[in-house]
A protein has these predicted regions:
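Intrinsically disordered, low-complexity polar/charged tails and linkers
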Residues: 1-165, 169-173, 177-207
Length: 207
């Protein structure tokens, strides 16, 4: 059973990947898209020679051309999913699109995008200057949010990718994680440290 985050965190998108054991030619898929695009509302792009991007049935697929120099299965990404059942349904829809029969295909979750809220106004400039944390990056000329990186004591594997953008409203955008337990632990750490810093800043903010 997949772990579910607390009500503080909402999964807004899942990027997953799967492999086709029966490869399909990109030109064939393009022809299928042309045949079905008006009827099924398919939108597709082939701007790079080895990548075909397709929007279909509420999902986005990125199909990679199989190399002629390898026997490995053909790789495909799927996004715009909110839960695991979305991924399963999306894969079956893709099999229909490429004219292959339904089958169970394993998938890997590569990345979650989540939203969260600390529930209060956060003076991010003061939090940054007060905390002096090595995990905080504040560049207001680039983005109006405090960037918070995941510390290695929460996830050694995701310390370079899992991050949170914290806005003054208290809203958070969390990306780069592939494990909901780690994302929950990361957000809990952010919440406790930022709120604690805000409490020490209360006299300054009120003066």
């Amino acid at each position: 059973m997949m772990f579910e985050c607390s009500r503080d965190i909402e999964v807004t998108n899942i990027k997953a990947s799967f492999k086709l054991d029966t490869p399909v030619d990109l030109e064939y898929v393009k022809n299928r898209c042309r045949q079905l695009e008006s009827k099924l509302g398919i939108v597709w792009y082939h701007t790079k020679p080895n990548i075909l991007t397709i929007r279909f049935s509420g999902h986005t697929y990125i199909l990679f051309k199989r190399s002629s120099h390898t026997e490995q299965a053909q790789h495909c990404n799927i996004t715009r999913c909110r839960c695991c059942s979305d991924i399963v349904i999306g894969i079956q829809n893709f099999l229909f699109l490429i004219d292959q029969p339904p089958k169970i295909i394993d998938y890997t979750i590569d990345n979650y995008s989540c939203s969260a809220n600390l529930g209060q106004f956060i003076p991010i400039d003061l939090v940054y200057s007060k905390s002096r944390s090595q995990y905080h990056i504040y560049q207001p000329e680039r983005i109006s949010a405090l960037e918070i990186r995941c510390p290695p004591f929460i996830s050694e594997d995701r310390k370079d990718s899992l991050c949170c953008l914290l806005y003054r409203s208290g809203k958070c955008s969390i990306v780069g994680g592939n494990n909901l337990l780690e994302i929950q632990a990361f957000f809990d750490w952010i919440k406790s440290t930022v709120i604690e810093t805000c409490q020490t800043l209360a006299p300054i903010c009120q003066s």
